[in-house]
């Protein structure tokens, strides 16, 4: 017998079968209007309502049978179920009913786990308790008359006017510290004529159109080896053309341009996610990469920093995953990043674009809870974003996680991964993944070191090079402050002057040393400059908290090493300051690429000393080719010297703060070790019964790989020194001066013969 459930609903799980149930059990009919009460009770109490043979009746809380009888119509008839739909009545539809999007927001769900580090800080409370509160130590040692932080800053127009007046009025300091003349000066003691010429050239107050005072001989002497090495013979070019796929179809797809993402025939959930992020028009790298990636082609991509490489591979991956078979969940996409911060940013972009889909994204990086990551991987997320070391750890030791079904593999910033010593890890991951996968390799700088990795991991890839190898953003203004040898000790004071007098917000300052970055963090705090730091000596929670504070505007200055020089995209960064020029031009590009991103303007300032000539020559050479802005910045050295004296007076206080921080850290480490010993005594058998975690390399293999890398570096350095000693004429294109000098020498030789 079937009951018409238009007005009633049978509650309970039936496990006995209908004949027996009709004889021994009593069914209770619940009105549809009260269904939401029972559903809510199920969620809260977490049990299933069943019917037992021994029960005479089923009692529901907040349920009135008389009220049901009153609501029940008198003319209810039992009918057989028919395929025809019953006519709708006015009472069937509740006009006041509303769909609520956040009705289950209080319920915990595994898919809602966003690694937003409010959660990370809770799960890692033990680790967070081991950190030292540096701000509290600094506030205890700061002078009582110092203000915490300035409440308001002058506007940008107010800042620019006195700066311009300062540059025009102080001609003497400009002649001493202007950077234009010093680019070719080899010795400080030159003739008075040369000094007067350099003073005239130093009187620069506006952007320098081209550094003509740097001779071409300086470029040729330093970069002759690079130019000769970069010239490829015909055989090498033929090999590359045979390896890369550059047919008519690929070329036609790369030449076509898309005015918007909608013209790419993307799905509506992806377009909605892009529009929520404010992405409307694709960048050049996205315009060329997305159609090729949707076809499943292997891609080698290179573009300038801030050009949108992350979205260039995230969008086609999500589009392809929308059409995946959903019956059996499995991990299909692997994205490898060199640093934790870059992986976090990539995860954030992927989750936001995929917010209107059912695609699961998992983040696996060091510094986070290993157990939480294992739980996420057991659910087999569609996309795994990881650093190479942590991914190999999960690949070998996490139960239920395999890479057999990986269909797409992405290596972001591949050259950085190779530079950081991840070559062995990448080879291990590549060999473990299926060969039939699609592989995409992206980087801002595509060097020759990546060639071996490309040949090992990619199959007939398409090259997508949007800009030159060494380019900066068009709206980036590059400024240089020359630091003379006699003023080298005033570098910290110059930095404080720039931050106190000129740039008050959204500024990243790069250092070469972690220890010095931490020391400057203490000095900034003592001088009431609101700053935070990020480098490799900090825990993952501290690094993430620093990025969050800087992004949210709680801190105005971010003191960083090259950990933050790649991929970190924080909206609205106005200024990047290089405390020292970096070791290579590539690192310089990544540092200054933190500003002037996605079509916005920015400013990069470099404190350049005498030892930074080689890097700066590369910067000047590329800027003349790009016609970008290069500015000579002059500082008010009266104020700089005042800041220098103030920093010198603070030196004992800085040392006291560092010693106090060290003592607190040692105390917390001792407490942690004590707790660890207690846990071993209590749960020793359980701890020893756990399976040991394995690695793909033994200690001997690690040492051998490190030794081989060091040997390669030494042999490379020796080769360069030998090439510099040998006076072998290098093959390069003759300039006009070379031709004139050759003509003069031939004329002299002919006249001597006569």
UniProtKB/Swiss-Prot annotation:
Q: Which residues form the Helicase C-terminal domain?
A: 475-641
Q: A GO term (biological process) for this protein?
A: rRNA processing
**Catalytic activity, reaction form:** ATP + H2O = ADP + phosphate + H(+)
Q: Where is the composition biased (Basic residues)?
A: 742-754
* EC number per UniProt: 3.6.4.13
- Among its keywords, does the record have Transferase? no
Instruction: Provide the Helicase ATP-binding domain boundaries.
Output: 290-464
* Motif DEAD box mapped to chain: 412-415
* Motif Q motif in this chain: 259-287
The cellular component terms of Gene Ontology attached to this UniProt record, alphabetical and capped at eight, are: nucleolus; nucleus
Protein name as catalogued: ATP-dependent RNA helicase drs1
Q: Tell me which species this is from.
A: Schizosaccharomyces pombe (strain 972 / ATCC 24843)
Question: Gene for this protein?
Answer: drs1
